[in-house]
Design a protein with these regions (language model features):
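Cysteine-poor, low-complexity segments in flexible/peripheral regions
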Residues: 144-205
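Amphipathic alpha-helical polymerization modules
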Residues: 1-142, 201-298
Length: 298
């Protein structure tokens, strides 16, 4: 009696082993990476969705970094301006004190010395830098904006420009990152630097002290009005930061829904594939009466 042998048995066995080996590899990759998609062939549609998701995540991360850096930058600027207001309020009080007609020349000279110190403090604050760049020089961030100048009516010279700088914090959304130094400290509606210098000159001449003090008060109000820009920008950044954080969470959840592996299931698949692979080896070796099919395949 003759035995008929399937002429395709060897190709079929090799194909079966290859398929089972692929299942083993796929389960092993899922366990190692925690992901179901480790190469495009695993899930072409899922891979396309992941690429899109990762692109949006990258852009969102960039915007989030911009927001965080800008918050630190604007908080540094606003803190400097707050210190400037404190110094100016002290100068206003000194101006009121200097208006007392009973003061001696020595007393007034002492007040002038204090005001000169405040003037120097204001210049230092106006030259505040963050991350190696100046905050109040307009777009000339590498140029020291202010310097004391005894000849200038304002008592200082300004080497910045009048440009504002905006940064994108989301698609189509930008925020102003600065108020130029001349708009803050040399505003035509009330020059803070000019008013300080004017008060110093008035006290030195013992003339017009009261008017100079009023002028300084007006300049301080104008300065405070310009400072509001920083508060508004910080509020906008806080809101955008919250939105971007929420978006990052949503994108991470979306990525997991597309790609996260069920590790328990992957481990089960690996075990099942291992058993199936070993069974195929043994069964096919028995059919071919070979001690080890792998030896044949080699």
């Amino acid at each position: 009696m003759s035995i008929r042998v399937n002429p395709n048995i060897i190709p079929d066995m090799i194909a079966g082993l290859a398929q089972t080996q692929q299942q083993l590899n796929q389960a092993d990759q899922q366990i190692a990476s925690g992901r179901t998609i480790n190469q495009p062939s695993d899930n072409p549609a899922g891979m396309a969705a992941l690429i899109l998701n990762h692109g949006v995540q990258s852009q969102t991360d960039t915007f989030s970094t911009n927001v965080s850096d800008l918050q630190d930058r604007l908080q540094t600027a606003d803190s400097a301006l707050s210190s400037a207001i404190t110094a100016v309020n002290q100068a206003i009080s000194l101006g009121v004190e200097a208006g007392n007609s009973t003061l001696s020349n020595i007393d007034r000279q002492a007040i002038v010395s204090q005001l000169s110190g405040i003037q120097q403090q204001l210049v230092s604050l106006a030259n505040t830098a963050y991350g190696g760049t100046y905050l109040f020089g307009g777009s000339l961030v590498e140029t020291t904006p202010f310097a004391l100048d005894s000849i200038s009516p304002n008592g200082v010279t300004y080497s910045g420009n009048s440009s504002t700088v905006s940064v994108e914090i989301n698609d189509g959304a930008t925020v102003a990152t600065n108020v130029p130094g001349d708009q803050l400290f040399l505003n035509p509606s009330g020059s803070l630097m000019g008013a300080i210098q004017g008060l110093i000159t008035a006290i030195q001449n013992n003339s017009g002290i009261s008017a100079a003090s009023v002028t300084l008060g007006t300049a301080a109000s104008v300065f405070n009005g310009e400072r509001v820009t920083y508060g508004s920008s910080l509020t906008q950044l806080q809101s955008m930061g919250n939105f971007l954080a929420s978006q990052q969470t949503q994108l991470a959840t979306q990525e997991n829904n597309i790609d996260a592996a069920d590790l328990a299931k992957a481990s089960s698949n690996f075990s099942q594939a291992s058993v199936a692979y070993q069974s195929l080896i043994e069964a096919e070796a028995s059919i071919l009466k070979l001690p080890n099919l792998l030896t044949f395949l080699q």
